[in-house]
Amino acid sequence: PALPEDGGSGAFPPGHFKDPKRLYCKNGGFFLRIHPDGRVDGVREKSDPHIKLQLQAEERGVVSIKGVCANRYLAMKEDGRLLASKCVTDECFFFERLESNNYNTYRSRKYSSWYVALKRTGQYKLGSKTGPGQKAI
């Protein structure tokens, strides 16, 4: 799960943006980072400019996640890799859900059993290796 900086989430109206935030993974203590070259990973430094993310509601409970500095969108590919796309595609939409532990989970809309996750090393976890209730995010 990722803990948004505003302390929580709920569905917000389609077409609206949330204030830029950082998504934190309790497992390993990493913030999700989107690089300008399209790489995605985790970093512990709160001051890293590439952890500032803009979430936009596409429909109720569905968001796109854009790296503010990278100007790229988080995407999950058909092989489960996470990367950052210059354009919004159907692989850039995620179901956002506030879990009982007050962390948000982000599940791919296109590959509906796969979640955004970081390993304890800060590398992203393949979507095919994720599931609900996972410790990695």
Swiss-Prot record:
Heparin binds at N27. Transmembrane segments: none annotated. Its main location: secreted. Residues 119-135 are annotated as: Heparin-binding. The record marks K119, R120, K125 as: Important for interaction with integrin. The keyword Secreted applies. It is found in: Secreted; Nucleus. The modification Phosphotyrosine is found at Y73. It comes from the Eukaryota. Pfam families: FGF (PF00167). There is a cross-link at K86 (Glycyl lysine isopeptide (Lys-Gly) (interchain with G-Cter in SUMO1)). GO terms for biological process: angiogenesis; branching involved in ureteric bud morphogenesis; cell differentiation; positive regulation of angiogenesis; positive regulation of blood vessel endothelial cell migration; positive regulation of cell division; positive regulation of cell migration involved in sprouting angiogenesis; positive regulation of ERK1 and ERK2 cascade. GO terms for molecular function: growth factor activity; heparin binding; integrin binding. Keywords: Angiogenesis, Developmental protein, Differentiation, Growth factor, Heparin-binding, Isopeptide bond, Mitogen, Nucleus, Phosphoprotein, Secreted, Ubl conjugation. PROSITE patterns: HBGF_FGF. InterPro entries: Fibroblast_GF_fam, IL1/FGF. One of its GO terms (cellular component) is extracellular region. Monomer. Homodimer. Interacts with FGFR1, FGFR2, FGFR3 and FGFR4. Affinity between fibroblast growth factors (FGFs) and their receptors is increased by heparan sulfate glycosaminoglycans that function as coreceptors. Interacts with CSPG4, FGFBP1 and TEC. Found in a complex with FGFBP1, FGF1 and FGF2. Interacts with FGFBP3. Interacts with integrin ITGAV:ITGB3; the interaction is required for FGF2 signaling. Interacts with SNORC (via the extracellular domain). Interacts with glypican GPC3. Acts as a ligand for FGFR1, FGFR2, FGFR3 and FGFR4. Also acts as an integrin ligand which is required for FGF2 signaling. Binds to integrin ITGAV:ITGB3. Plays an important role in the regulation of cell survival, cell division, cell differentiation and cell migration. Functions as a potent mitogen in vitro. Can induce angiogenesis. Mediates phosphorylation of ERK1/2 and thereby promotes retinal lens fiber differentiation. This is Fibroblast growth factor 2. It comes from Oryctolagus cuniculus (Rabbit). The gene is FGF2.
